[in-house]
């Protein structure tokens, strides 16, 4: 993994971190979810610290919006694709052929697992260097501090339809420690929009953002 900028001392642990439970073998994937759990926490810590330093005058609400934009599954999947991580994931053919949201989540999970082994192999500084390299440019993006989607949708719904957004959980998939919620939102007579996330709140935010984008209230920048 040259793009991590780190020479791994424990290559076997790196291989385990990129082996999904669907891969063949009695012990395949036994560490994958544990590494993913740790990597999620390391990523959140480093990005939060990075944002505090970069935006010293930002309020907690703005920092939370920026953090969520940087650590959601879509952002992680894009970074994973950029560094060529999908080609290194060992998984069963049924998983490797996933499309849509499930493929996004697979790549995001693998990137979190990679961050965990960076931390375990080289300490916090190794993980921090990698995260700063790929997340810091994104932290300055114009859309990183976009207003809370649910709040903006509620205001727009009142003005456009004299209505209140109605959210509904359509599905909940995945293990208890890493669920995937799909939520739809309806505003008056407008067509509903859907969104997914690792929490009910994240899915509601994604659905609200999807409706705002579709109706032209937000642009795609």
From Swiss-Prot:
rRNA processing among the record's keywords? yes
Q: Which GO terms describe its molecular function?
A: double-stranded RNA binding; metal ion binding; ribonuclease III activity; rRNA binding
Annotated Mg(2+) binding sites = 36, 109, 112
Q: Which UniProt keywords apply?
A: Cytoplasm, Endonuclease, Hydrolase, Magnesium, Metal-binding, mRNA processing, Nuclease, RNA-binding, rRNA processing, rRNA-binding, tRNA processing
Q: Name one GO cellular component term.
A: cytoplasm
Q: Which cofactor does it need?
A: Mg(2+)
- Which PROSITE patterns does this one have? DS_RBD, RNASE_3_1, RNASE_3_2
Question: Per its UniProt record, what SUPFAM superfamilies does this chain match?
Answer: dsRNA-binding domain-like, RNase III domain-like
Catalytic residues, per the record, are 40, 112
Which compartment or compartments is the protein found in? Cytoplasm
Task: Name which cysteines form disulfide bonds.
Answer: none
Q: Recorded E.C. number(s)?
A: 3.1.26.3
Q: Which GO terms describe its biological process?
A: mRNA processing; regulation of gene expression; rRNA processing; tRNA processing
Top-level taxon of origin: Bacteria
Domain DRBM: residue ranges: 148-217
The record's subunit annotation is: Homodimer.
What family name appears in the similarity comment? Belongs to the ribonuclease III family.
State the NCBIfam families in the record. RNaseIII
Briefly state the protein's biological role: Digests double-stranded RNA. Involved in the processing of primary rRNA transcript to yield the immediate precursors to the large and small rRNAs (23S and 16S). Processes some mRNAs, and tRNAs when they are encoded in the rRNA operon. Processes pre-crRNA and tracrRNA of type II CRISPR loci if present in the organism.
Q: State the protein's name.
A: Ribonuclease 3
What is the organism field in this record?
Answer: Mesorhizobium japonicum (strain LMG 29417 / CECT 9101 / MAFF 303099)
Q: Which gene encodes it?
A: rnc
């Amino acid at each position: 993994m040259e793009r991590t900028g780190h020479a791994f001392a424990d290559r076997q642990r790196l291989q385990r971190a990129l082996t999904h439970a669907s891969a063949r073998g009695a012990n395949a994937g036994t560490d994958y979810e544990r590494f993913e759990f740790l990597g999620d926490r390391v990523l959140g810590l480093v990005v939060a610290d990075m944002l505090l330093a970069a935006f010293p005058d930002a309020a907690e609400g703005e920092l939370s919006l920026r953090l969520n934009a940087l650590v959601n599954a879509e952002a992680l999947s894009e970074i994973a694709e950029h560094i060529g991580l999908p080609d290194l994931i060992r998984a069963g053919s049924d998983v490797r052929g996933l499309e849509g949201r499930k493929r996004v989540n697979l790549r995001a999970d693998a990137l979190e697992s990679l961050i965990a082994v960076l931390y375990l192999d080289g300490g916090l500084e190794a993980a921090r260097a990698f995260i700063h390299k790929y997340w810091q440019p994104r932290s300055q993006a114009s859309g990183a501090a976009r207003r809370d989607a649910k709040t903006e949708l509620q205001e727009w719904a009142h003005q456009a339809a004299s209505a209140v957004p109605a959210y509904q959980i359509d599905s909940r998939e995945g293990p208890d420690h890493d669920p995937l919620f799909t939520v739809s939102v309806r505003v008056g007579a407008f067509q509903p929009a859907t969104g997914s996330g690792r929490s009910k709140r994240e899915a509601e935010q994604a659905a609200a953002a999807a409706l705002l984008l579709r109706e032209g209230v937000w642009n795609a920048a």
